[in-house]
Regions:
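An extracytoplasmic/periplasmic, membrane-proximal ligand-sensing/linker region
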Residues: 301-344
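A ligand-binding cleft/hinge motif common to bilobed small-molecule-binding domains
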Residues: 107-111, 229-249
């Protein structure tokens, strides 16, 4: 969808605008709610925004502002981890400068919720989300899944093990981006699930037959060019590549029940009481915003009833590990381990 079309669509006033939210929600059968049925946003609101995907989060904010002219939205931008630490420091000092925190990763969300800065969210808002993504003090916005992009001319699907741990002992040439934050979160999940000893051995094994890239788009492009057989990357890099090159020699494989199929999420936390912060979150969970981020950013909608990006397996068919995503907050042991092995 073109940016202008999205802004106009979200800003357009509809016949349902004046309905109370509870009534509008009852009219919705799929779980997703149209912005036309949401209450207007009025007043001052400060949002701390972690860096989003290619400015698309900024487009969402502009659309919300255009639809709600009486909303005075102030945005502070920065890295999610740095903003989370700022919120914790402000909370300890008894200073409140932010009403909302929208982060690109759950680790940063965990830092804020563990500090006691998050306000509880109402049941009707949480019930819009998939059952496995409903939390009392924060709301996921969109998801991303760890995948194994592979070259379809060099690798057959049956050559790819179901366990990501088994790749350390395979003959496949592997592409990875150890300095990339999402990869480090993936290794953190592996540490939590498998232990430091097994993770250290895995890093050593992979490093023997891996090619290093600066980022995970580079990994996927390297796979497609045949520089490597298989790689580690978030799902959307492959979908973006294939959207511009439908016949690209790359497809997605998924491991089962381990960190290689981890589903992470961007999320938002209400830091102030009252209806305004909560109603702002409702806009992010609206059918229009969820569909926009699925189409343009290839992110996974976590609200029930919204179509996932084309080319991605349905979440219900995947086997991600069961874990508290907020535990991914502390990367320091992971970075120390990666430096010890020599991959950083």
């Amino acid at each position: 969808m073109q940016r202008r079309t999205f802004l106009q669509g979200l800003a357009a006033a509809g016949a349902l605008t004046g309905l109370p939210f509870s009534f509008a929600h009852a009219m919705t059968q799929t779980g997703s709610v149209s912005v036309e049925s949401l209450p207007k946003l009025e007043g001052d609101l400060t949002l701390y925004l972690g860096r989003g995907e290619g400015g698309l989060y900024e487009n969402v904010l502009k659309a919300i502002e255009k639809r709600n002219p009486k909303l005075n939205l102030k945005v502070r931008r920065g890295g999610s981890a740095a903003l989370a630490n700022t919120i914790v420091a402000e909370t300890k000092a008894g200073v409140k400068r932010a009403d909302l925190f929208w982060a690109v990763d759950t680790g940063s969300i965990g830092v804020v919720t563990d500090a006691g800065a998050a306000k509880p969210l109402p049941d009707d808002l949480r019930s819009q989300l998939r059952e496995d993504f409903q939390y009392p003090s924060w709301s996921p916005v969109t998801g991303r899944v760890r995948t194994l992009p592979y070259n379809t001319e060099r690798v057959k699907p049956e050559q790819i093990p179901e366990s990501v741990m088994a790749l350390a002992d395979s003959d496949l040439k592997i592409g990875w981006a150890p300095a990339y934050s999402s990869f480090q979160s993936f290794v953190t999940a592996m540490r939590i699930l498998e232990g430091d000893k097994a993770t250290k051995a895995w890093l050593k094994g992979i490093n023997k037959h891996a090619k290093k890239y600066a980022g995970e788009l580079g990994v996927v492009m390297g796979v497609e060019r045949g520089e490597v057989d298989i790689g580690f990357a978030n799902h959307y890099y492959t979908l973006r590549l294939k959207s511009g090159k439908p016949n690209a020699n790359v497809a997605l494989a998924y491991s089962k029940g381990d960190a290689g199929c981890l589903v992470n999420a961007s999320g938002i936390v209400a830091l102030s009481d009252g209806d305004l912060p909560v109603n702002f979150i409702r806009y992010l969970l609206s059918h229009e915003v969820q569909s926009y981020l699925a189409r343009e950013a290839y992110e996974i909608p976590l609200v029930q009833g919204v179509e996932p990006p084309q080319g991605l397996a349905d979440l219900s068919t995947l086997s991600p590990p069961e874990m508290d995503l907020r535990k991914l907050a502390d990367l320091r042991p992971t970075l120390n381990l990666m430096r010890e092995v020599g991959v950083l």
